[in-house]
């Protein structure tokens, strides 16, 4: 019994594919930021330019969407964007694992955003935060109905926030695996002479599309976080 418990405790600390590749992603982010800011120059190099471009892009997004008072939370949003982006890109490496295709990973991030902005809304505005659900511009008879819809849509946010990212990352990889399954057909049949080149071209096209999707999904998750932050900072309709 004692030995069994020891094994279970040991296995608890064994890293999974998800934790391993998330750790690699964090190390890559740290490397980018350290190398990009280590020797700052007036005429930036490639890595410094990449770091500054990413920083400026997210800084402007937070300011435009959440307002200047939302810049207080810029470090968190910037870190979130980089983590998702690098996790998405890591999945494009052959034999690698995509942490953001795991609903447990995206679910934790989405719930963190949801709980954080909700707590922030109540801390800053108290009960006035509930004005977010009261559409004062609508006709009075419709306001209670719209309030119920707003409440439901608010609590659905973490679900849609997490599933959108995980689903898109998982779907793209699944399609690539389907095309890859047709690639070896040239070894087994005459039909493969036609099918295999088409499969290879499809894989290349899908890979290029997945690079775009990796960035777009990181952008979508981040900008939605900014929108939710804006609702917490300025809850009135």
Curated annotation (Swiss-Prot):
Residues passing through the membrane, by range: 18-38, 77-97, 103-123, 132-152, 185-205, 209-229
Cellular component GO terms held in the UniProt record: plasma membrane; plasma membrane-derived chromatophore membrane; proton-transporting ATP synthase complex
Function: Key component of the proton channel; it plays a direct role in the translocation of protons across the membrane.
Protein name: ATP synthase subunit a
GN (gene name): atpB
Entry membrane topology: Multi-pass membrane protein
One GO MF term: proton-transporting ATP synthase activity, rotational mechanism
InterPro entries: ATP_synth_F0_asu (IPR000568), ATP_synth_F0_asu_AS (IPR023011), ATP_synth_F0_asu_bact/mt (IPR045083), F0_ATP_A_sf (IPR035908)
The keyword Transport is assigned to this record: yes
Family: Belongs to the ATPase A chain family.
Chief place of localization: membrane
């Amino acid at each position: 019994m004692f030995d069994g418990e020891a094994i279970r405790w040991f296995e608890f600390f064994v890293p999974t594919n998800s934790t391993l590749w998330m750790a690699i992603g964090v190390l890559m982010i740290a490397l980018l930021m350290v190398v990009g800011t280590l020797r700052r120059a007036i005429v930036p190099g490639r890595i410094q330019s990449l770091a500054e471009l990413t920083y400026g892009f997210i800084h402007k997004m937070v300011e435009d969407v959440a307002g200047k008072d939302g810049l207080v939370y810029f470090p968190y949003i910037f870190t979130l964007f980089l983590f998702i982006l690098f996790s998405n890109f890591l999945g494009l490496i052959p034999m690698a694992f995509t942490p953001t295709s795991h609903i447990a990973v995206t679910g934790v991030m989405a719930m963190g955003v949801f709980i954080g902005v909700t707590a922030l809304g109540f801390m800053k505005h108290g009960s006035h935060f509930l004005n977010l659900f009261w559409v004062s511009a609508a006709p009075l008879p419709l306001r209670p109905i719209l309030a119920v819809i707003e409440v439901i849509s608010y609590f659905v946010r973490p679900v849609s926030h997490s599933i959108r990212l995980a689903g898109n990352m998982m779907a793209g990889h699944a399609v690539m695996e389907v095309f890859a399954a047709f690639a070896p057909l040239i070894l087994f049949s005459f039909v493969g002479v036609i099918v295999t080149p088409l499969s290879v071209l499809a894989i290349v096209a899908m890979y290029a599309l997945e690079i775009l999707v990796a960035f777009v999904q990181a952008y979508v998750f981040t900008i939605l976080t900014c929108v939710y932050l804006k609702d917490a900072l300025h809850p009135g309709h």
